[in-house]
Amino acid sequence: MDESVRLLNQMQARICENKLRRYRGMNVYAKKGETLMVGSSLMEHFLINEFLLAEGLDKVVYNRGVAGWRTDELLKDMEACIFELEPSKIFINIGSNDLDRPGDALGRLIKQYRKILRKIKERLPGCL
């Protein structure tokens, strides 16, 4: 692996871990049973709370997106990014970063997505 790629991967891993540490800290104060957005960069950068404020809507939506995330990373960190919040509704957008991996990327993505959905159904059966 090229040295610059290795360094970028290390930097991405540190950034991700910092976000997860911040999310875990914020989860302590989160209200259970609210709406959650989780996934990769499209979710992380989606300005849902700004839209809600602009429309005068009094809703709580938690955002636990992490730019660059793949489905295997979400599977590993579902506790901090989903289950600690005990959401009643979840919007998931993840998988685009999985598609640039070698081999059967689409097949692997579908398999991983099914695992994510199965774990949510098991742990949060009332969640939509």
Regions found by a protein language model. Give the residues of each.
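N-terminal secretory targeting modules
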Residues: 1-36, 43, 47-57, 88
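Charge-dense, low-complexity intrinsically disordered segments
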Residues: 10, 68, 103, 107
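Soluble or luminal CAZymes and related metallo-dependent hydrolases
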Residues: 15-18, 70-74, 108-112
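Alpha-helical cap/lid subdomain in secreted, periplasmic
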Residues: 54-56, 76-128
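Conserved beta-strand elements of the Class I
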Residues: 36-38, 62, 90
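A short beta-strand-loop structural module common to alpha/beta enzyme folds
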Residues: 58-71
